[in-house]
Amino acid sequence: MDNRPISRSAIPNLEDLPDDVKTKIQSVQEKTGFVPNVFMIMARKPDEFRGFCTYYDAIMETECNITKAELEMIVVATSAQNDCLYCVVSHGAVLRIRSKDKNISDQIAINYKKSKITERQRAMLDFAVKVAKESQSINDSDFKILERFGFDIEDAWRIASVASFFAMSNRLANTFSMLPNEEFYACLLYTSDAADEITG
């Protein structure tokens, strides 16, 4: 059991939060049985919390040509590149649920190029990692590779949006030493419906 504080930042009392923020957190708790630490950490800034949740839902929950499991692969691969403990553990948990593969998260976090994934998924992650680490060097050839695997410009936008959003999340989590909940390590106990709620 990790007894360290979950963040360097102050953690608000649930009862002191605006009603809509409190309702969101309580809804997550009802569905999953716990409150992911990121919710309480972000809730200290209600406007940022609302923006965080809205953008998360827009890029992670809306339908596109990329599966929800593949979106989680992007989060895990790019967060690993950014050395983000919180996001690798929490989204690794969701990836195991969504992919129904207990090994995939560790493989992607350690070395996605050697992971048991398709060539299409590897091309997707190559692009995502380049967005996360060296976006200034992205050029036409990167988009041509995506096109070869069936990704269009809107898919490229989604990949880049996920990588960019979580680059921000990774930096906040690292700066304020955010710790993942113990419950994430027992993720296989949760259902796919719960996976929609436990990260953001």
What are these regions (language model features)?
Residues M1-S192:
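Hydrophobic alpha-helical segments
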